[in-house]
Amino acid sequence: MAGVWKVLVVLVGLAVVACAIPHRRLRYEEVVAQALQFYNEGQQGQPLFRLLEATPPPSLNSKSRIPLNFRIKETVCIFTLDRQPGNCAFREGGEERICRGAFVRRRRVRALTLRCDRDQRRQPEFPRVTRPAGPTA
């Protein structure tokens, strides 16, 4: 019976210590890297995207919710399970996207919301062709 009590005390002690240890804060760069990896996994058969710049929030007070804001650009590599975008060159004239979202961590649950839209300011402009409205001779 004494052995059972010792095991129970050890288990309770371990549970208290596990609850008392704070979650390690993820660095903003780590969260952005995870978000980009998640985004690229949805690009099967499409070009991978690589990080151009990340804009961390002015202050990161929350351990549980991290707002995301970063830009990515298309690379010359196509998605495969083992390909890392960091090893791929940017595609000349490649599409750029602005990504916004949030990373939320509550106890053992992690959630990522992410939306990456084309950066309209960075798209190449094509010359406009004007034609006369009337019939041509």
Curated annotation (Swiss-Prot):
GO terms for biological process: defense response to bacterium. Keywords: Antibiotic, Antimicrobial, Disulfide bond, Secreted, Signal. GO terms for cellular component: extracellular space. It comes from the Eukaryota. It is found in: Secreted. Large granules of neutrophils. It holds the Pfam family Cathelicidins. Residues 1-20 form the signal peptide. Its main location: secreted. Disulfide bonds join C77-C88, C99-C116. One of its GO terms (molecular function) is cysteine-type endopeptidase inhibitor activity. Belongs to the cathelicidin family. Binds to bacterial lipopolysaccharides (LPS), potentiates weakly the early antibacterial effects of BPI. Inhibits the late lethal action of BPI. This is 15 kDa protein B.
